[in-house]
Structures are given as C-alpha cells and as structure tokens.
A protein has these predicted regions:
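Start-transfer (signal-anchor) and selected internal transmembrane alpha helices
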Residues: 1-40
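Membrane-interface transmembrane helices that cradle and orient dolichyl/undecaprenyl
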Residues: 150-163
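Transmembrane-embedded, aromatic-rich helix segments that form part
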Residues: 165-167, 178-189
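Membrane-embedded alpha-helical segments of multi-pass membrane proteins
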Residues: 5-16, 35, 100-104, 141-149, ...
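Short hydrophobic/aromatic helix or loop-helix immediately within or flanking a transmembrane segment
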Residues: 56-64, 70-92
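Alpha-helical transmembrane segments and terminal signal-anchor/GPI-anchor hydrophobic tails
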Residues: 49-51, 55-60, 64-65, 81, ...
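Membrane-embedded helix bundles of polyisoprenyl
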Residues: 122-140, 144-149
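Transmembrane-helix signature of polytopic, membrane-embedded enzymes
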Residues: 27-28, 110-131
Length: 353
C-alpha cells in the first residue's frame, strides 16, 4: 500500500529541488544552493528510527557514546567515536548528530556540483543526485560522509593541489576506513597527463609511484578486513549496471567532445570516474554490500548526467540520448516512492514515532 506522506515528501522534494537548482543556475545564486542543502539535510537529519536500514543502530551507538560506554561498540572507527563524543559534548542529542552529518555530506556534494556549474546543467545534476544517491545519507551514514569528503577533494585534484587532496582523503578515512581507496583517483591522472604542464606531469609520476607502493600494502589490509563481505554471495545478477555502461559508451558517439583542453579534461575525467564506479558497483551483483566500495566513484554519475544535459541538441540522437536518461531518472524516482529499497519507506519524522 502506498504511503501518502512519503509520496508527498519525496516527490515534492524532487520538484522543489529541480526548480530551486534552476533558479540558482539562472541567477547564479549561492543562497539557493544553500537552501537545497538545508532541505536535503532536514529530510535526512530529522528522520525517525524507522527510516533507513541502520538508523536505529546508529541511535544505539550514539546513546552508548553519550554514556561513555564505548567498549561495546564494534566495527566503528575510533576516530568516528571521538568525533561523535565531541559533538555530543556540544549538544547531547542524537538528532543533532544526524542533522550535522547530513549537512556535511549533502553540503560537500552539492557544492562540488555547484563548483562544476560551468560544464554541467546544475538542475539535472542535483535531481540526479537526489534520486539516485540521497537515500545513502539515510543508510551507511559513515561511508556516505567519507564519500562526500572524497568527492569534494576532487576539486583540489583537478587543480593539481595534490597535497590538499591527500589530506582530505585521510580526513575521510577517519569516518570510514574504506575511504583510503580515494587515493586511486591519483592513478586516473596518468590517463589525463597529456592535459598537464611539465611540472604537474612530474609530480603525478612521483605520486603514482608512491600510491602504487603503499596501495599494495593498504589493499592487503582492506581485503582482509572486508573479506567477510566477499563470503556473502548473491545468486542473481542485475542488468542496470550493464545498461549504464552501454549508455556511457554511447555518449562518446552522440555528445560532442569539447575542443578546449580544460573542458576535455573535465569531460573525460568525469566519464572515467563514473566508469570506474560502474565497474566497482557491479560487485554488488555478486557480493552483498561490496558494491558500496564503488560509491566513491559511482557518485560522479550525477555530474556526468549534468554534463550530458549541458550538451547542445545538435542531432536527434542527442535528444534521444537525453530522453533515455529522463526515463531512467523517472524509473528510479518511481521505485523510490513506491517500493524503496534502502528502508526509506514509509518516511516519518522523529517526532512522529
């Protein structure tokens, strides 16, 4: 049975966000961008225990941290526990933590999209993010925080500020140790090295050598830590990632390649990040939860789709290609508000329980 409140909230928010993003795009209004972040964060941060697969678990964890009983907390980074303890010292309220974490994750991602507004359709990127990824802020909260920090760090990566990028990757790992995979973004720089000046090329070669060396050690540790997830196998395969991979390849034929070097770098880098995300996310069809590791790259689908809708409608194929993505987003939205999948239905605010 359909839940009316959930439909009003999720569908209504999709419409509001699209037109707010359109207003921000046309008026270059950072205030409208902040309003988008606040609306997303309120829905995520004010949710009840019943919304999201692990919200109740996090409530229990926050209660234990508040009481100083941290020995009974397993599988959570000590650094995350310390961060929660500091925040609870400001206001001993679990909902305060949910709201702060929602503001951080949604804020970093939305403002990363906003920073790329010259190369994308901001409204379509925001809508894509909301429909496809917003529910992750209701589940796997620590990892989604880490993902948002990595996504924001790519702004430094594209400017060649590699030290800042690495610092942000380390900060992200304080929330979720899997964030260390973010250093793999440096490996992609080898592919785009032709777009860089000589000094940046040299830095990249040195950094990649270091990343490969330490990455082997780190990967061994991570594989051991997450080996239990490889043991939980699925017997069925899906086709959505295959469809998305085909559409990504199709985009090279129907979307005009920019002539400006900087724009080409933006276009190709985002496509490669997204492609890596598709490949890694496909693990979810074989191993339960392992697809989440691909979220660090897969989330670039939002910027990729924004870039698609920014392209000029020079041929009927371009229009058809965009129409396919409209249908895809509508399909996801329909599933979100009628079936869920991340425990987001029925939506209730914390004061309603």
């Amino acid at each position: 049975m359909l839940d009316v409140q959930s439909i009003i909230i999720y569908l209504g928010l999709a419409i509001i966000l699209f037109f707010l993003a359109k207003y921000a795009e046309l008026r270059k209004s950072s205030g409208a961008v902040w309003l988008i972040v606040i609306l997303l964060s309120l829905i995520s941060g004010l949710r009840a225990d019943s919304v999201g697969i692990d919200t109740e678990t996090y409530n229990t964890i926050f209660d234990l941290i508040s009481k100083g009983v941290t020995k009974g907390i397993y599988g959570i980074e000590e650094s995350f526990i310390y961060i929660c303890r500091v925040l609870l010292g400001i206001w001993d309220n679990n909902q305060f933590l949910f709201l702060i974490f929602a503001l951080i994750s949604n804020g970093l991602i939305i403002f990363t999209i906003w920073d790329n507004r010259d190369n994308i359709s901001f409204r379509w990127s925001v809508l894509s993010y909301y429909i496809t990824f917003f529910t992750f802020s209701l589940n796997g909260m620590r990892q989604f925080l880490a993902v948002s920090i990595i996504v924001y760090a790519t702004l430094f990566l594209k400017k060649g500020k590699y030290v800042k990028f690495i610092i942000f990757v380390l900060i992200a790992s304080l929330f979720h140790r899997s964030a260390i995979i973010g250093v793999c973004y440096l490996l992609f720089e080898i592919i785009f090295v032709k777009y860089f000046e000589s000094k940046r090329k040299l830095i990249i070669y040195l950094l990649v050598g270091i990343v490969v060396f330490f990455g082997i050690v780190a990967t061994y540790g991570l594989v051991n830590y997450y080996s239990k997830y490889f043991e939980q196998q699925l017997s069925s395969m899906g086709i959505m990632m295959i469809v998305k991979a085909i559409m990504l390849i199709w985009s090279f034929g129907v979307i005009e390649t920019p002539k400006n070097n900087q724009e080409r770098y933006f276009c190709f880098s985002n496509r490669w990040y997204y492609f890596a995300g598709i490949l890694l996310n496909s693990l979810n069809y074989i191993f339960v939860y392992m697809g989440r590791i691909g979220l660090y790259f897969y989330i670039f689908e939002s910027i990729y789709i924004g870039n698609i809708f920014k392209a000029k409608n020079k041929t009927i194929w371009t229009l058809m290609f965009k129409f396919c993505y409209v249908c895809l987003l509508l399909y996801y939205l329909y599933n979100n508000i009628t079936r869920g999948g991340q425990g987001e239905l029925p939506y209730r605010f914390f004061w309603q329980i």
